[in-house]
Amino acid sequence: GCDIILGNEEDAEKVFGIKPEGFDVTATKGEVNAAEFESVCRQLMDRFPRAKKVIITLRGSVNANHNTWGGVLFSDGKLYQSPRYDITHIVDRVGGGDSFMGGLIYGLLTYTDDDQKALNFAVAASCLKHTIFGDFNQVTVAEVENLMKGDGSGRVSR
């Protein structure tokens, strides 16, 4: 068994045949609605009943250099949704998933009773990674926390 399942809706469909119920992901035109993915989380939890958390990354692609980025975390029957960031000048997407998982591990260990904050940390860490060339994240915890505090616009500057 596993404690945490991490992926995206495409992974769930291609690997397990799980699709969002009543929702066509291909019709979203780059927009993501996190609540639509609760059914995917529930289906994964049903398939893997010993899993404690399901996390889905949400990328909306405007173009090659402009994406939206967020995520959802499902645990104990509750869906948490991160802020959605607008990354307008992507430097390098390589390492984005690894930095998300690294941020999630850090967040879950640091904010042990706050799944929302752990998810927000993972998304912010990965978001900042998109502004750095190379396959690993070089930002500090303080930089991630500053982005988490943000001004609410969702725009990323580094």
Task: Give residue ranges: language-model regions.
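Conserved phosphate/ATP/ADP-binding segment of small-molecule kinases
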Residues: 1-78
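Conserved post-catalytic alpha-helical subdomain immediately downstream of the catalytic base
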Residues: 80-151
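Structural signal for terminal/edge beta-strands and the immediately following C-terminal loop/tail
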Residues: 153-158
